[in-house]
Amino acid sequence: MNMADASDQAASLRGELKRSEPMARHVSWRAGGAARTAYFPADADDLVAFLRALPADEPVLMTGLGSNLLVRDGGLRGTVVFTQRALRDVRLDHLGVLGGGVYAEAGAASPKVARFAALNDLAGAEFLAGIPGTVGGALAMNAGCYGGETWNIVAHVHTVDRAGKRRVRTPDEYEIDYRSVVRREAGGGRRDQGESAPHSSLPTPSRREEWFLAAVFNLKRGSGAESRAKITDLLKWRIAAQPLNEPNAGSVFRNPQGDYAARLIEACGLKGRASGGAMISDKHANFIVNRGAARAADIEALILLAERSVQEKFGIALEREVRIVGEA
């Protein structure tokens, strides 16, 4: 980013602009290099103004809580926009249908949406309590767990493009699959960018590039008590099955059809395998944990080891849920 140009624009922006921002502070793995530029918008309008001020060739990464994201130790040449400070509103949205709607901004934590829906006697969003990221990331990759998937409850989404133009889009404008969301008109398989769309580099800047600002979820009337009980059960299962006491990014790989990535990795004898300060969890083999001083390179080495081992033993190419960006 041309910082002189950014400084010229600063007077009209209300958010916080930082340079050489350590990404380890902002990703759930607590490891990795720095972003050349970071911006924390004051609200959605400020985010729009910032995007309009950016040079057209500036790579942009939008993120919330940094779940499913790893920035290599050499850092990221581009701008990271953080949504979790300001774009976190969750409120009722009356859809005029049987049930009700919940409007949630991209930076709102997914579990917050689940709890809000339950408090308002709306059912169908309970599974979001098991997704550690934000709404933006859940939309970008169709995050899911415990039998639920994000786009199964989406009524419509609000987006913004590189030029700062806002749109309202419906699910039929996207090709939605398991951990995959691609806008139909975005040729070349370009993926709408959210918190952690699972590919390994920033896309070439394009005016067709869009990010999710918010979603309205279409939910059914239900029993708040039953929803809260279901959320409690889900969280108990998560605590029992996953290494939540150590920094991690959730599931590293998608589950292959008819199988589980964790089973395949464990069958390769990799459970508990360490590289530097990182380790394939001895509690859940599809998790890689930071034991306290891991570098991004340590984590990536274990990802590559798991991919190579499963390919050699089973002939299965594991697909990543996590996104790795930046330079080694």
What are these regions (language model features)?
Residues 122-127, 132-171:
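Glycine/threonine-rich beta-strand-loop-alpha-helix active-site module
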Residues 17-19, 25, 31, 69, ...:
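Phosphate/pyrophosphate- and phosphate-bearing ligand-binding catalytic cores of soluble enzymes
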Residues 40-41, 70-73, 81-82, 116, ...:
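Short beta-strand-to-turn element immediately C-terminal to the catalytic PLP-Schiff-base lysine
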Residues 69, 114-117, 125-129, 142-149, ...:
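A generic local secondary-structure boundary/capping motif
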Residues 2-135, 145:
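Anion-binding (especially nucleotide phosphate/pyrophosphate-binding) glycine-rich loop
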Residues 38, 101-103, 156-158, 214-216:
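Beta-strand secondary-structure signal
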